[in-house]
């Protein structure tokens, strides 16, 4: 059976001397993998469509196991991302998180649209770190994780938030922050932005400017929470941390 899908390449794996296994997150089927025979050959008709982060239409011969990529038509190569090491690093984090967080052939058009919109914004020049924070926040419910972003994790009141508790699974107010000695102190902006990112429609994203110190706190909150409850190891996250460390 042949299936035509619109999708974005989120992973490629070399297979033999000339082939690739291409993993595509599609609007119609969710995540699907297919053998792209001869894709490593420079003159192959599949060489360009099998590049990481390529957005296109793909014709796949489906089977009980791994499908076969027959042909593809490029919608966008995301060249702005490919030509910039910082954009490549953040986009790689986004597509790897998508890959690790999803199962094969689980239809999720909402997630496809979120992935596409995030990469599209990145190509348009929106802060890639902010986009990665938004994406990481919005992936929480996809992974079945629902931290307390709206109320204190202990008293469930909407009040002043001064810390984030991984143990309690959310923000803590000033009255209950002392109950977790390992809490992460945060500023008011961290709570407001994480709450906003969790709920708002990504299509409505306008001009966004976030202080470096706030982004650093948000990253710490999200990474610590993911480490505790998700168990996903991302190579791209390590590279991002190295970029930040050496300020390349």
UniProtKB/Swiss-Prot annotation:
The keyword Lipoprotein appears for this protein: no
Which keywords does this Swiss-Prot/TrEMBL entry list? DNA damage, DNA recombination, DNA repair
- Pfam families given in the database record: RecO_C (PF02565), RecO_N (PF11967)
Q: Can you quote a single GO CC term?
A: bacterial nucleoid
Looking up InterPro entries in the UniProt record yields: ARFGAP/RecO, DNA_rep/recomb_RecO_N, NA-bd_OB-fold, RecO, RecO_C
Keyword Cytoplasm in the entry? The reply is no
GO BP field: DNA recombination; double-strand break repair
PANTHER family, A to Z: DNA REPAIR PROTEIN RECO
What's the family? Belongs to the RecO family.
> What function is annotated for this protein?
Involved in DNA repair and RecF pathway recombination.
Descriptive protein name: DNA repair protein RecO
Organism the protein comes from:
Bacillus anthracis
Question: What is the primary gene name for this protein?
Answer: recO
């Amino acid at each position: 059976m042949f299936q035509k899908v619109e999708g974005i390449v989120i992973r490629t794996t070399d297979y033999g001397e000339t082939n690739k296994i291409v993993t595509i997150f599609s609007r119609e089927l969710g995540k699907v993998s297919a053998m792209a025979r001869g894709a490593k050959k420079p003159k192959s008709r599949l060489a360009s469509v099998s590049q990481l982060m390529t957005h296109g239409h793909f014709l796949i011969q489906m089977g009980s196991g791994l499908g076969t990529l027959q042909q593809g038509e490029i919608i966008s190569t995301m060249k702005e991302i490919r030509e910039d090491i910082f954009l490549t690093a953040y986009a790689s984090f986004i597509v790897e998180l998508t890959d690790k967080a999803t199962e094969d052939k689980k239809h999720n058009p909402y997630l496809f649209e979120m992935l596409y919109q995030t990469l599209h914004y990145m190509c348009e020049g929106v802060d890639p770190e902010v986009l990665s924070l938004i994406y990481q926040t919005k992936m929480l419910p996809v992974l079945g994780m629902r931290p307390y972003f709206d109320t204190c994790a202990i008293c469930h009141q909407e009040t002043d938030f001064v810390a984030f508790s991984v143990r309690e699974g959310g923000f803590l107010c000033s009255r209950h922050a002392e109950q977790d000695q390992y809490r992460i102190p945060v500023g008011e902006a961290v709570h407001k932005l994480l709450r906003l990112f969790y709920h708002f429609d990504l299509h409505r994203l306008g001009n966004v400017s976030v202080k470096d110190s706030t982004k650093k706190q948000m990253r710490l909150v999200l990474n610590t929470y993911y480490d505790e409850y998700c168990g996903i190891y991302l190579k791209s996250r390590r590279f991002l941390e190295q970029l930040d460390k050496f300020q390349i």
